[in-house]
Amino acid sequence: MSKYETVIGLEVHAELSTNSKIFCGCPTEFGAPPNTHTCPICLGHPGVLPVTNKQAVEFAMKAALALNCEISRETKFDRKNYFYPDSPKAYQISQFDQPIGYNGWIDIEVNGETKRIGITRLHLEEDAGKLTHSDFGGESLVDFNRVGVPLVEIVSEPDIRTPEEARAYLEKLKAIIQYTEVSDVRMEQGSLRCDANVSIRPYGQEEFGTKAELKNMNSFRNVQMGLEYEVLRQTEVVSSGGKVVQETRRWDEANKKTLTMRSKEEAHDYRYFPDPDLVRMQISEEWIEAVRATIPELPDARQARYVNEFGLSKDDAGVITISKETADFFDETVKTGAEPKSVANWLMVDLLAHLNANNLVFADVKMTPKGLGEMIKLIEDGTISSKIAKTVFKEMVETGKEPKQIVEEKGLVQISDEGALRQVVVDAVNSNPQAVADFKSGNEKAAAFFVGQVMKQTKGKANPGMVNKLIQEVLNSL
């Protein structure tokens, strides 16, 4: 066991799903041609005046309330001064000493234990542009479409002690933000980004160690791997008598290690000052309560409902509710009359396996809740077997066809005619005298052999329960 304790704090940026930017009317649509969603305001031309997007403020309030934050009754925007090619104004409009939300928390669960992670602050700011570095010619290209897109930055307390806890925190945070529908939180499109501050210290020491900031982690898996590597690196440095240098490092996914980006000897002086072009905002109790009323059922409450109302295990309910899309699909399917535990099993096992195997996301699923509900009823009434249902399920997910249509087109109706199945069983028994002898000598596996033979002859369409019953009857009658 290491004699050093890990201390991790996370900074998460989530783009808000407003139709227009935070201080101008330019659209926020992802994937538009470079530099087509810009105007003099977001590009910082002289003489222009920004106007605050009210929906962005309310989305930030909604996220803050969902994360159990207190809301500042008075808040303002500040200029964060720095020069970088992706920031055309040479400053970023952010919030310094009066964030919109503060003193929040979320509960995470790791290895069956619940832990509360504090949230220092949640503040609004504008996004920067996107730089693309060319491998040839030494050129860097900048796309200003993203400049001015509203963000919330969510800063955790340094309460996280392991990379596993960091991943659990991110998954829970993403789920809560997704449930509020203020952001689509898609890391692959950059609408959710995470930086991590990590340090180590001897157990029992109150003072923090020297931290490194990790960037370029574009998935939760990479965040966990990057932190695991960095903790190991810092432990080796300190254990060998060296000192950890305060710096910014990036995760090199190809080589699975962190690399130095730049030294960070001391905190930047961004010379924050209140933006003179934007008025202070007074946030009334009535406004806060109006926003609070728009918050839907959140993951923890939904998980508890699934346990109490449908009898799901806490773990199964947690798997379903970690994604709003999956939870919504579950609810809609149950409304069709399908048995909740069956719905949960199909979603957790078969659907997730299909998505993972094909590198897909839930949005790629063409199956409808109504279709899944009908398929489960086909199993329950004996029209198809559970084995055949897997074939039907896969086609439903890929094509969106209704289950009855698939069953009819492929001739998948389960054979439950006892007379017809008895003849298949008798034929299998007559054709395999050695297996019969094995059964008679007490080898129960021989019965399973005959099940396989019958299923082979019926192309998997025989009713499994009836097949087992008939095999026992025929063999015991010999």
From Swiss-Prot:
Gene3D superfamilies: 1.10.10.410, GatB domain, N-terminal subdomain. Signal peptide: none annotated. One of its GO terms (biological process) is translation. SMART domains: GatB_Yqey. GO terms for molecular function: asparaginyl-tRNA synthase (glutamine-hydrolyzing) activity; ATP binding; glutaminyl-tRNA synthase (glutamine-hydrolyzing) activity. InterPro entries: Asn/Gln-tRNA_amidoTrfase_suB/E, Asn/Gln-tRNA_Trfase_suB/E_cat, Asn/Gln_amidotransferase, Asn/Gln_tRNA_amidoTrase-B-like, GatB, GatB_C_1, GatB_Yqey_C_2, Gln-tRNA_amidoTrfase_suB_CS. Its EC number is 6.3.5.-. Keywords: ATP-binding, Ligase, Nucleotide-binding, Protein biosynthesis. It catalyses: L-glutamyl-tRNA(Gln) + L-glutamine + ATP + H2O = L-glutaminyl-tRNA(Gln) + L-glutamate + ADP + phosphate + H(+); L-aspartyl-tRNA(Asn) + L-glutamine + ATP + H2O = L-asparaginyl-tRNA(Asn) + L-glutamate + ADP + phosphate + 2 H(+). SUPFAM superfamilies: GatB/YqeY motif, Glutamine synthetase/guanido kinase. The keyword rRNA-binding does not apply. Allows the formation of correctly charged Asn-tRNA(Asn) or Gln-tRNA(Gln) through the transamidation of misacylated Asp-tRNA(Asn) or Glu-tRNA(Gln) in organisms which lack either or both of asparaginyl-tRNA or glutaminyl-tRNA synthetases. The reaction takes place in the presence of glutamine and ATP through an activated phospho-Asp-tRNA(Asn) or phospho-Glu-tRNA(Gln). Heterotrimer of A, B and C subunits. HAMAP family: GatB. Belongs to the GatB/GatE family. GatB subfamily. This is Aspartyl/glutamyl-tRNA(Asn/Gln) amidotransferase subunit B.
